[in-house]
Design a protein with these regions (language model features):
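Edge beta-strands of extracellular beta-sandwich domains
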Residues: 472-482, 567-575
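Beta-strand-rich structural segments
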Residues: 415-430, 465, 507-520, 559
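Extracytoplasmic Gram-positive cell-surface binding/anchoring modules and repeats
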Residues: 551, 575-624
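Zymogen propeptides
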Residues: 25-232, 237-239
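Conserved, well-ordered active-site substructure
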Residues: 113-141, 279-346, 357-402, 406
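Low-complexity "stalk/linker" and mucin-like segments enriched in Ser/Thr/Pro/Ala/Gly
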Residues: 431, 441-453, 496-498, 524, ...
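Extracellular/luminal low-complexity segments enriched in Ser/Thr/Pro
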Residues: 449-463, 542-557, 612-614
Length: 624
């Protein structure tokens, strides 16, 4: 639980959760689900996590569970080239240009922040776009997946005793030997060190592309020496090696090649990966054969961070997972992530790039475009090397056959007013026109006109909203918690939570309270809470309007807001309605008094009295 600002030791905000439950290591505080397709379910979940030290934190998760279906399949996608990064929405736009519509998506590979080049393999449309030795996730045409080490190896047979090991579409260093580039990388290599380059083209009519378990014959058609950024042919490949490489024999082998010479490029992979159509590299294996892994290599493994992971369950269904480390969500360590993926039923699970890279996107049924589902750690989504999407064929929408309510779930208190949006989709979940005869109703709610409902006073359990239109029906359920985790109190129209309150005697102050439940903002009205003040301070009504007692001296006490077993108490001081001895009857008296009690100015004290000198020249002492 966060500690609010304290202006002084005496001004302590007291927040009490009476009879608060003892939470396990991870306990689900609540969740809402939404079907994105026949076999794809989106779950927004809130967990209460207890660390090894006993600290309780909130965790907000976005989980997409997918079972194989004809209309939706997983794919890997990146920007126009491997070099550089791409925003999720721009990558989605590229998919749309290819005739696909995003159902949901998460970020994929770890990558070099300076170049955007992903670590590990990348496969799209059954074509190997980049090599690598990292663990990976691969998807087959039927929507199934494989996780593990793909053991992808690219070799070059140049007629020597031993074929050369090749790094495919990676940045050149003096340590990584022979490289092979295609225009998937970019139009140029953009390397920062000089190298020796050999231009090759496939023999016959073969395309300049590599596939798993493939052998490709190429012909030497040119050489380029002592160049950092060398052009990559559109219809071929570029072999390269650093001039200062530690692999001198490999450099000599490339330098020995002559025009017209025939070379063989061979790609091999582990059994079970031959038919993978999309893949991207990842990091540590989190769950293997149903058991949680504990030996991690990631440098931030023990840090609480935003995380992205993917897993395969015993029945073959897939789990796409993200958790936030922003706002009111603390993130997970890698060990906690492994335990969470196991708890979600994963037989095998793989860690993907996290932290500021963590991203979750979703197209809510009834909407024509996608939205960001998670809260990014950097305040906005980071451009990444690649993404994993669930996609369907894009097509014109038919007649509405499904109705949706948004928000599709959440938390509310009695008396709250909830604004809702009604959307419609056809049988393929494509956005469709909403029938015009929309009616709102439900359980523990009352239609409040237009697109609003009001939660009934005294409602318990859940408020269920129902929308009907054109013979279709949709529901959204809002849990009514018995207690809250925090109730910040603010001035009406202000955003800063109060840690104490000081007002003038006889003044009226409009206050508002907001309920929070494990980091989730709860729909509420001021009448959802019980307001009370110490008798000596004045009165407060059900809407949070505080009327202070008339007094010529400071009176102290407390103001308390309560919901269920949760209360928030502010220390309150009611002072004189005329704090300054020299402002009575002055034209600016009320303004000066208001600023004084707002803490904006303080005046000066003399002989036990407070003076403002309203007509004197302004000095710095007037302002705090």
């Amino acid at each position: 639980m966060k500690t609010w600002l304290k202006r002084a030791a005496a001004a302590v905000l007291s927040l009490s959760l009476l009879a608060a439950p003892v939470l396990a290591a991870a306990e689900t505080a609540g969740s809402s689900t939404l079907n994105l397709s026949d076999n794809t379910v989106y779950t927004y979940s809130t967990q209460s996590v207890t660390s090894d030290s006993g600290k309780q934190t909130n965790l907000h998760e976005n989980i997409f569970t997918y079972r194989k279906e004809a209309q939706v399949r997983p794919v890997v996608a990146f920007g126009s080239t491997l070099y550089g990064t791409s925003a999720m929405n721009k990558t989605v736009k590229t998919l749309e240009e290819q005739g696909y519509s995003m159902v949901a998506g998460i970020n994929g590979s770890f990558f070099d922040r300076s170049t955007g080049i992903p670590y590990g393999i990348v496969i799209t449309n059954s074509i190997l776009r980049s090599g690598g030795s990292a663990n990976a996730v691969g998807f087959l045409a039927d929507g199934s997946a494989v996780i593990g080490d793909p053991e992808v190896t690219v070799t070059l047979d140049y007629g020597g005793d031993t074929p050369l090991l090749v790094n495919y579409n990676k940045a050149m260093t003096t340590q990584n030997g022979v490289l092979l580039y295609s225009q998937d990388y970019d139009t140029r290599t953009k390397n920062t060190i000089e190298g020796y380059h050999v231009i090759v083209r496939p023999s016959g009519s073969r395309a300049a592309e590599l596939r798993l378990s493939q052998t490709l014959t190429v012909e030497v058609v040119g050489m380029v020496e002592d160049t950092k950024s060398c052009a990559i042919p559109e219809d071929g490949f570029l072999l390269a090696i650093a001039n200062d490489t530690i692999y001198k024999n490999a450099l000599a082998a490339l330098q020995s090649l002559v025009m017209g010479e025939q070379l063989t490029i061979q790609v091999t992979c582990a059994s079970g990966w031959e038919n993978v159509t999309s893949a991207c590299g990842g990091g540590d294996i989190l769950v293997e054969n149903g058991s949680v892994c504990t030996d991690f290599t990631l440098d931030s493994a023990k840090k609480m961070a935003a995380r992205t992971a993917i897993g395969v369950k015993n029945d073959g269904s897939l789990v796409f997972y993200t958790c936030d480390e922003a706002g009111n969500s603390e993130g997970l360590t890698l060990a906690q992530l492994a335990e969470r993926m196991q708890a979600l039923g994963c037989r095998t699970a793989l860690n993907l790039d996290g932290g500021g890279s963590t991203a979750a996107g979703v197209t809510y049924p009834g909407y024509a475009s996608g939205a960001t589902a998670n809260v990014p750690s950097d305040g906005k989504l980071r451009e990444c090397a690649n993404f994993i999407f669930l996609v369907r064929q894009k097509k014109d929408a038919g007649t509405a056959s499904k109705l949706y309510l948004y928000p599709f779930g959440g938390y509310t208190l009695p008396d709250a007013k909830i604004a809702l949006t009604v959307k419609a989709a056809d049988s393929s979940y494509m956005a469709a026109a909403v029938p015009t005869d929309v009616t709102l109703g439900g359980t523990n709610v009352t239609a409040a006109g237009g697109s609003y409902v009001t939660v009934d006073h005294g409602a318990k359990g859940a408020a269920t909203v129902t929308a009907t239109a054109g013979g279709l029906r949709a529901t959204a359920s809002f849990a009514i918690p018995e207690a809250l985790t925090s109730i910040p109190i603010k001035h009406e129209g202000k955003n800063t939570a109060l840690s104490s309150l000081r007002v003038a005697g006889g003044s009226t102050t409009e206050l508002t309270a907001t309920g929070w439940y494990y980091g989730n903002k709860v729909y509420s009205a001021d009448t959802s809470f019980t307001w009370s003040v110490s008798d000596a301070l004045g009165t407060i009504d059900a809407d949070g309007t505080f009327t202070a007692v008339q007094t010529g001296r400071d009176v102290t006490g407390t103001l308390t807001v309560t919901y269920g077993e949760t209360s928030c108490t502010l220390p309150v001081t009611v002072g004189s309605s005329q704090p300054f001895d020299d402002t009575k009857g002055h034209w600016a008296e009320s303004c000066i008094t208001e600023l004084y009690y707002a803490g904006t100015l303080q005046g000066s004290e003399k002989n036990g009295k407070l003076y403002y000198r309203p007509d004197a020249s302004m000095t710095r002492q007037e302002f705090i």
